[in-house]
């Protein structure tokens, strides 16, 4: 048998992608490159995998993040060797904090070409450090290493991912030649060593873990509890909300949950001494999902637990989410499974904290008076649920997500964010991945600095068919720093960095429709009309004064603090 390295490279990649499929991978994100040829060709040849392409590896990583976020499945990412690999790090860091399952398949030069001056060769082993939950550095494909070893080695890292979430890194060094027209059958005896696996269709080496046992309803039904709903799916949020209602407890909904309650606006009313004192009578906090937006809710939670309140945290993610290092009972299991066991019988609700909805209503009333129906960030946040309608919502990491946390009320909206590292990079790409996975219309709310940061990824919307509305709230720089005690003399130059840019020509560059409304009525008509009758992407630019939003927030907080 004549040796053909290109064919052997492809046999390894074919085996790899088939096992990835059996672990649940359905989407593969591919950037251009020559060294990654075996990976790209075999991903393309697999009839049950869907390919997504992008010329920018940083954007590609975030595209995969969005796909994984929305599909709740692992997503594979294929890049060539060199700095292409390094450009995945921002998305990998985000997945390391929020749990999305990325499978990073990085092509590499063989070991003899690393560290010796060869072109496009960097040290790729361990490049993602502890941002991945597991890594595997494969040898160059060869017949002395069995396909059985390849499968059990890949299975090990994928099982670790199945348990803990996050990204895994499989580094794939491919020797040349990379191109060949020879058939794989020249290595048929080698391929046949795993023919039973190929025929049976299951994972080569499987593992099972038992579920933890949650408490019974009898243990908690007489307690004064508070339910906190963080970053979860809409279905999980509804189940958690129903549980809180069944118990008669206050339910505090983070905007990432896509739901609201009679206790909305807590980031504002927690500044009122009377409201805070009433909520502080609780003796049990149950948090579903992670990554809360509200800093004041974090501070209140810390105060309560330090005073002796029990703190339970329900999340399938094994990783710690306990930034104040509090005593915490973490139930590592699916939220639905936990609730199904706990709520297995009727209970008489023990309603308490009955005065708090009054503060919530006052937050909403005063916010509307401050905004005065003008086109401003506070008014958009107040009307966000009606603007999004039945579409999905993606909230960027600007001042606006905090405004939604303060005054917004989302009534059953599938909501997505990147609130792990809370970076302003990759938001266009992540939102595109979410929409590709769900095939639903989407409203994307993003700040101007975030939009500038990921401008390349507007290319992902150029051939969009499903309606998407991208609203850029342009307050000319980082208006969020108006809420922080930064040195006033350096605030503009070193923090806000005003740019003076508009986004009309960015939209034209990528073939997107563009409008710049001047009233709330026009904004509503444009968004609702595009969802009803449009297709493709519409970029809506909303220009607001730089310090308007922070002034509105201060006015609202001052009013609510004074209530008795």
From Swiss-Prot:
CDD domains: TPP_PYR_MenD, TPP_SHCHC_synthase. InterPro entries: DHS-like_NAD/FAD-binding_dom (IPR029035), MenaQ_synth_MenD (IPR004433), MenD_middle (IPR032264), THDP-binding (IPR029061), Thiamin_PyroP_enz_TPP-bd_dom (IPR012001), TPP_enzyme_TPP-bd (IPR011766). Its cofactor is Mg(2+); Mn(2+); thiamine diphosphate. Keywords: Magnesium, Manganese, Menaquinone biosynthesis, Metal-binding, Thiamine pyrophosphate, Transferase. Pathway: Quinol/quinone metabolism; 1,4-dihydroxy-2-naphthoate biosynthesis; 1,4-dihydroxy-2-naphthoate from chorismate: step 2/7; Quinol/quinone metabolism; menaquinone biosynthesis. SUPFAM superfamilies: DHS-like NAD/FAD-binding domain, Thiamin diphosphate-binding fold (THDP-binding). Homodimer. Belongs to the TPP enzyme family. MenD subfamily. This is 2-succinyl-5-enolpyruvyl-6-hydroxy-3-cyclohexene-1-carboxylate synthase. It comes from Vibrio vulnificus (strain CMCP6). The gene is menD.
